[in-house]
Amino acid sequence: MTLAVLIVAAGKGTRAGGGLAKQWRPLAGRLVIDWTIEAFQRAGCGTIMVVRDPDNEHAIEALAPYPELLLADGGPSRSESVRNGLIALQEIGVERVLIHDAARPCVCPQVIQQVLDALDDTPAAAPGLAVTDALWTGADGHVTGTQDRSALFAAQTPQGFHFDAILAAHMRHDGTAADDVEVARQAGLAVRITPGDVNNIKITRPEDFSRAEHILRSTMDNIPDIRLGNGYDVHRFGPGDHVMLCGVQVPHERGLQGHSDADVGMHAVTDALYGAMAEGDIGRHFPPSDPQWKGAASDIFLRHAVELARSKGFTINNVDCTLVCEYPKVGPHAEAMRARMAEIMGMDMGRLSIKATTSERLGFTGRKEGIAALATATLVRA
């Protein structure tokens, strides 16, 4: 049975505020339309068409990452936009269609599937929520009466139809309609009510964005929180007979200068961990103006960053550190450095890389004036 989804996204959405149609606005790190499209992709709906304003630059930009989508031009009203989409779908031989508001990004697979199941033995089906609030009639700011709510439902989408039936209904329809169920009923189609979902809200007012974000983020609880941090550090050479690199004392004719032990590699890794947590850098936690850190072993800083990550629920997934210098030679000490860093961070050596390169005699490292280090760390919180 050939199924298509028709997402109606040609509206202006002015009541939601923000100076931009709601379907093109950001929501929980993405755009509203992204969440809506993904909801149907997750539900296994392969053919998706979006009806949009072809001249809207925000629509063009938002839909560019989806080359697999079918597109149709919107009309001056919702019903005309739907009609345009249905006519376009007619060319690909659709048997069933789900028509959905782009501004309902929180629709869940269960709601979608229940509509599809109902179409096995009825020409039209749509989700609805039984009205539970008391209903009043009113005039001039005063209550004039109450309304029986026992037979009232709040309509939702997607609204599903046998394709030929709803296409014929729209082709005969003249005028506006609240939704496609109204068009179907005017054409004499029986419409079954399937269970709605309180979270399947339609973004209409500005405050709906915060509610929708809360709903979407609650569904993301099983998605790992993955953080990436970068660290960079430099220390110049000075008097001494060794350098500290990634926790290992490496004999050398010169030392590295710094407020602490100047372990440039460990500092870069530490800053990468802080960066992944948005916790600043070493200087924020261990100010160089504080004399107690003069000459301090850098593993103090690294251990603090590791413990802070664990206190926030993060696991250190992997660390990659590159030392940039002409000398000393790092290769003979690299495994000892990996072992020491893995011990401090409590991680498997297979997830920790320490390597070295030169700058081809360019810059301060090429002139043998000091050592630079770059590090990347990935943290994961389940």
UniProtKB/Swiss-Prot annotation:
Set out the biological process GO terms recorded for this chain's protein: isopentenyl diphosphate biosynthetic process, methylerythritol 4-phosphate pathway; terpenoid biosynthetic process
Which pathway does it serve?
Isoprenoid biosynthesis; isopentenyl diphosphate biosynthesis via DXP pathway; isopentenyl diphosphate from 1-deoxy-D-xylulose 5-phosphate: step 2/6; Isoprenoid biosynthesis; isopentenyl diphosphate biosynthesis via DXP pathway; isopentenyl diphosphate from 1-deoxy-D-xylulose 5-phosphate: step 4/6
One Pfam match, given by its short name, reads IspD
- Paired cysteines (S-S): none
Query: In which domain of life is the source organism classified?
Result: Bacteria
Where are the residues of the annotated region 2-C-methyl-D-erythritol 2,4-cyclodiphosphate synthase? 227-382
The residues listed in the UniProt record as binding a divalent metal cation, with positions renumbered to this chain, are 233, 235, 267
Biological role stated in the UniProt entry: Bifunctional enzyme that catalyzes the formation of 4-diphosphocytidyl-2-C-methyl-D-erythritol from CTP and 2-C-methyl-D-erythritol 4-phosphate (MEP) (IspD), and catalyzes the conversion of 4-diphosphocytidyl-2-C-methyl-D-erythritol 2-phosphate (CDP-ME2P) to 2-C-methyl-D-erythritol 2,4-cyclodiphosphate (ME-CPP) with a corresponding release of cytidine 5-monophosphate (CMP) (IspF).
Q: What name does this protein carry?
A: Bifunctional enzyme IspD/IspF
Q: Which organism is it from?
A: Ruegeria sp. (strain TM1040)
Q: Which gene encodes it?
A: ispDF
